[in-house]
C-alpha cells in the first residue's frame, strides 16, 4: 500500500490470487464460528495471513506460499495433502527470492535489517523436500487427482528461489 508500516490491508473490491484465497478462507472461518461481522472477518484474515497469527511487521506476513501452507496447517486451518496423492513427486525447495531480489520489494529495498530478518525466515526453507504434481501428470480428471470442493491449488515455478507463482 506504499507505507512503511505493516498493517492489515483489506480490499474486497480488488484481490490477487493469494488474497482471494485468504479472503474466502477468512470468510469461511468466520462463518464456521457463527460470526458474520467485519471485525470477525478481519481477525480471521490476520490469523491466516501472518506467521503464528500475529502481525509483527512486514516479515511476519507469510510471503512464500509454502510457508503460508505450513503455518496455516500448524494452526489447524488447512491440511497439505499433495503428498497423499498418487501422482505427487518430491523436490527440494530453497527459498531466497525475496532477499536476493530485495530491490523489487518496497519494504526490503535499502533496509538491511529487514533483509536479514527475511534471510532468517528463508533459511528455514533451505533443502526442504516438498511435494507437487508434475504438469505431465495433469492430463487426468479432477476425480483421478482427488481434487475436492474447496481445495487450494498452487502453481509451482522453476524460478530460482521461489516456490509458487499462482494460487
Protein language model annotation of sequence segments:
Residues 140, 148-167:
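C-terminal soluble interaction/assembly domains
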Residues 131-143:
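Short alpha-helix capping/helix-loop boundary micro-motifs
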Residues 2, 142-145:
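Short amphipathic alpha-helical segments, especially helix-boundary/capping motifs
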Residues 11, 15, 144, 158-162:
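Short, well-ordered coil↔helix boundary/capping segments
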Residues 3-131, 148, 154:
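Acidic/His-rich structured neighborhood in mature extracellular/periplasmic domains
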Amino acid at each position: 500500500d506504499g507505507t512503511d508500516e505493516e498493517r492489515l490491508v483489506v480490499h474486497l473490491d480488488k484481490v490477487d490470487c493469494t488474497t482471494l484465497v485468504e479472503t474466502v478462507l477468512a470468510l469461511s472461518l468466520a462463518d464456521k464460528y457463527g460470526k458474520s461481522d467485519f471485525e470477525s472477518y478481519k481477525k480471521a484474515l490476520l490469523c491466516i495471513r501472518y506467521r503464528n497469527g500475529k502481525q509483527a511487521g512486514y516479515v511476519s506476513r507469510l510471503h512464500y506460499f509454502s510457508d503460508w501452507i505450513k503455518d496455516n496447517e500448524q494452526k489447524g486451518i488447512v491440511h497439505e495433502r499433495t503428498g497423499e496423492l498418487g501422482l505427487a513427486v518430491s523436490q527440494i525447495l530453497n527459498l531466497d527470492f525475496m532477499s536476493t531480489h530485495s530491490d523489487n520489494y518496497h519494504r526490503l529495498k535499502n533496509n538491511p535489517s529487514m533483509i536479514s530478518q527475511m534471510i532468517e525466515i528463508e533459511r528455514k526453507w533451505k533443502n526442504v523436500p516438498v511435494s507437487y504434481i508434475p504438469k505431465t501428470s495433469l492430463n487426468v480428471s479432477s476425480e483421478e487427482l482427488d481434487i475436492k470442493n474447496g481445495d487450494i491449488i498452487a502453481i509451482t515455478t522453476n524460478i530460482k528461489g521461489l516456490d509458487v507463482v499462482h494460487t
